[in-house]
Design a protein with these regions (language model features):
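Positively charged n-region of N-terminal signal peptides that target proteins for export
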Residues: 1-4
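Bacterial N-terminal signal peptides
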Residues: 10-18
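Primary mode marks residue(s) on the alpha4-beta5-alpha5 output face of response regulator receiver
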Residues: 25-164
């Protein structure tokens, strides 16, 4: 094997390892989120832990033709400028024939609090930026860890979810 072939093979091998590690890291984080939120499959448990429907947000979020989100049970005490992978600010419950089922978690930072930090970049979690919901004035990121979302784990709207 000549030197150039050996060098190219080495670079390809290193890139493959980096990609595998990155994918494993992301999957590992999703597994951590699932373990941390498994206790909240019942809304009663979420309520006991401080998550609840909030005035004005106490309905099923639906975007006809795009998908739904469901009902957001929010821990108002957790709304600050920090996000914690294992303690999401909201549990998102989806309607089902058997009642509400945990479908996703949501990370939330109020825009006014984030702006007060002086940061010019949106907040981040796991190397990804939260995005601004201009209607609600919050930075958000959904993680569909309990209900498959064919559009992606991190997408807001899930075409597999609809509101009654």
């Amino acid at each position: 094997m000549n030197r150039k072939t050996l060098l190219v093979s080495g670079v390809i091998g290193i890139l493959a390892l980096i990609l595998i590690a990155a994918r494993t890291f992301g999957q590992s984080d999703l597994a951590k989120i699932r373990r941390a939120t498994a206790q909240f499959h019942r809304t009663e448990t979420a309520k006991a832990a401080g998550y609840d429907l909030r005035p004005g947000l106490d309905h099923c979020f639906d975007n006809p033709g795009v998908g739904g989100m469901g009902f957001h049970y929010i821990d108002a005490a957790a709304l600050d400028t920090k996000v914690d992978l294992l303690h999401p600010e909201a549990m998102v419950y989806i309607p089902s024939p058997d009642g509400l089922q945990l479908g996703a978690v949501e990370y939330i930072i109020p825009q006014d609090q984030w702006d007060a930090t002086g940061s010019t970049e949106p907040p981040m979690l796991m190397g990804m930026h939260l995005h601004l919901n201009k209607d609600l004035h919050v930075y958000i990121m959904h993680a569909w860890v309990w209900k498959n979302n064919p559009r992606g784990v991190w997408e807001d709207w899930n075409p597999n979810v609809s509101c009654p």
